[in-house]
Each structure stands twice: as structure tokens, then as C-alpha cells.
């Protein structure tokens, strides 16, 4: 099963490594898609320097906003055959520990919001 966590970013250099590590620690079948809105603080470079095959990045040329980042992420995930898609904020306002319970609920539901 291919599961994807979409993390839009803008100036998340102080949070992004911790967020990625916490997300990937939840389960082995997770990949992460970072959608960076041209963060001037170097967020995209930090992500690329991790050089992790479970992490993908879309670098956008300008700040296009959270909503369009999620739309682009959903489109990318469907093109890449992910079965389950999780959206989270990169600032840890969403607790990565909730990923497993949410994925379990998706076994018997089409949509889980938490």
C-alpha cells in the first residue's frame, strides 16, 4: 500500500527536519511530498540535502498559497498511484502520532478528518 503525507512549506527551515523525522518514524510505508513555495529561508535545500528516497519535493517559483499546494499535492499523488493521502502542516500543529489511527480508520471509511 502506498501512503503519502503532503507537507506544504513556506519558511519552515526550523521545523522541517523534525517534522519529516517524526512522520517517517510512524510507519515504514509512508512517503512524504514537500511542496515548497520558494521559501527564502532555504527550506527546500534542507529537504533536498536529506537525500532520502522516501521524500519528494515540488519547488514552486513563488508563494502560491496553502490551498493550491494541497491541490498540486493531491494531483501529484494520484498520478503516482498513492492509495492513501494525508495532509499535514509542517509546523507540527498536526501531531504525526495521529497518522496510524487515521490510516486504521481509512480501512473502513472513505475519508477521515482529524
Predicted features and spans:
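Short beta-strand-to-loop acidic/aromatic patch adjacent to the donor-nucleotide binding site
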Residues: 82-93
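Donor nucleotide-sugar binding loop of glycosyltransferases
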Residues: 12-15, 39, 95
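Conserved donor NDP-sugar-binding/catalytic core segment of glycosyltransferases
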Residues: 100-114
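Short loop->beta transition adjacent to catalytic acidic/histidine clusters or analogous donor-positioning motifs
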Residues: 2-3, 24-34, 42, 54-55
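Conserved donor nucleotide-binding strand/loop of the catalytic core
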Residues: 44-80
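A conserved acidic beta->alpha catalytic loop
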Residues: 36-45, 92
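Short, well-formed alpha-helical segments that are part of the catalytic scaffolds
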Residues: 12-25
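Short beta-strand/loop segment that forms part of the nucleotide-sugar
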Residues: 7, 30-39, 58-59, 88
